[in-house]
């Protein structure tokens, strides 16, 4: 049995859950478009189709960051987790292979940061927690911006600082983390190879 096939059979339940969620989302899109067509609301249908197209483009940008583990993590996160909604935006083309740090280290740092936020979420929330992760390339650095709307323990700041410190100069906080009663914001930078 090929390695890829073995992986699929070993993780069948998880893969089926992801595929079912993806199929469900696409069927919802088709139902909305069908309803607009039946009601003769063509402009609303066009606007909705534009929204679906932008979502597909966003997913394509995530898939092209040249870090398959992180792309898969981002693209499957919401299908596998219910406690926090994660939205990822890639503002400019990002190529993780151009970083000074290894791709696996970048994956570990970003995914662990999200895991820390997830772990430190307060159990009682006013609204469902929503995290926007924005990646972009500028001036020979890649930036990762985390913007959480939701209540999270203040302990997360210290753990994120330790996580960055453990990567010995391969990552740094751009500014102080901002923690309020309703959210948390941090921006990290990662130097590219010269």
What are these model-derived regions, one by one?
Residues 1-15:
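Conserved signal-transmission helix
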Residues 18, 23-39, 102-134, 162-163:
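Conserved ATP-binding N-box helix of the HATPase_c
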Residues 27-63:
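DHp/HisKA dimerization-phosphotransfer hairpin of two-component histidine kinases
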Residues 66-84:
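Short beta-to-alpha transition helix within the HATPase_c
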Residues 89-96:
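Conserved catalytic submotifs in the C-terminal HATPase_c
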Residues 93, 122-156, 186:
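Conserved beta-strand-loop-beta-strand hairpin that lines the nucleotide-binding pocket
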Residues 154-181:
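ATP phosphate-binding glycine-rich loop and adjacent ATP-lid/helix-beta elements
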Residues 176-194:
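C-terminal edge-of-domain segments
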């Amino acid at each position: 049995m090929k390695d890829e096939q073995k992986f699929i059979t070993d993780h069948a339940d998880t893969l089926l859950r992801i595929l079912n969620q993806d199929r469900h989302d696409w069927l919802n899109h088709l139902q909305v478009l069908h309803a607009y067509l039946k009601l003769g609301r063509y402009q609303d249908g066009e606007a909705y189709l534009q929204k679906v197209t932008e979502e597909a483009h966003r997913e394509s940008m995530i898939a092209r960051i040249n870090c398959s583990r992180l792309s898969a993590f981002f693209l499957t996160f919401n299908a596998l987790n219910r406690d926090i909604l994660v939205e990822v935006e890639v503002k400019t083309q990002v190529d993780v292979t151009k970083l000074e740090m290894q791709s696996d280290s970048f994956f570990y740092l970003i995914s662990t940061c999200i895991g820390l936020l997830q772990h430190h979420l307060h159990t009682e929330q006013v609204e469902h927690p929503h995290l926007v992760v924005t990646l972009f390339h500028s001036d020979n650095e890649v930036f990762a911006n985390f913007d959480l709307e939701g209540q999270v323990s203040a302990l997360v700041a210290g753990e994120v600082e330790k996580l960055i410190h453990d990567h010995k100069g391969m990552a740094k906080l751009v500014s102080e983390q901002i923690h309020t009663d309703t959210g948390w914001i941090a921006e990290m930078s990662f130097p590219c190879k010269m």
